[in-house]
Amino acid sequence: MSGTVKLHRVLPTSPEKVFRAFTDAAAMAQWLPPYGFTATVHELDAREGGRHRASFTNFTTGNSHAFGGEYLEFSPGKRLRYTDRFDDPDMPGEMVVTVEFEAVPMGTELRIEQAGIPDMIPVSACYLGWQESLDKLSKLVTPEIPD
């Protein structure tokens, strides 16, 4: 049986800026990997039907794992839905990630659901990884730095 995590955050910035962080390769390489990992974005065709592919590398051990998928829904500033599948045959199955961006008086309400987490990945580890990633996302999108 696969697992699901749900996360919720409010970020004090616009939905468009947060959405851009989910669809820009350089931004994703900065915020998406949990602490202790680096990321390489190998492919990012950010549109409905487009594909994405990335890998995370454990900075301590140097071990990497790659994953990729397809964008199922792409509504700028509002909603993303995409698949993720690991290259590792020991982690079969397809995960579906749904991200909703809603303008609220204090900025952007962000709701994330990741479903279909392979059995060999503890859901609590996945949840912790997302929390770390969202901390990094907040630090990327919150500052308003003029040109």
What do these predicted ranges mean?
Residues 8, 43, 70, 98-100:
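Short, surface-exposed charged micro-motifs
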Residues 2-8, 15, 39, 51, ...:
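Intrinsic-disorder/low-complexity, polar/charged segments enriched in Ser/Thr/Lys/Arg/Asp/Glu/Gln
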Residues 81-131:
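Beta-strand/loop substructures that line and gate deep hydrophobic ligand-binding cavities in soluble
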Residues 18, 28, 52, 71, ...:
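Hydrophobic pocket/interface hotspot
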Residues 1-38:
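Hydrophobic ligand-binding cavity/cleft-lining segments
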Residues 41, 140-147:
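Short, highly charged C-terminal tails/helix-capping segments
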Residues 40-83:
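Glycine-rich portal/gate segments that line the openings of hydrophobic small-molecule binding cavities
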Residues 23, 134-142:
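Short amphipathic alpha-helical signal-transduction/dimerization elements
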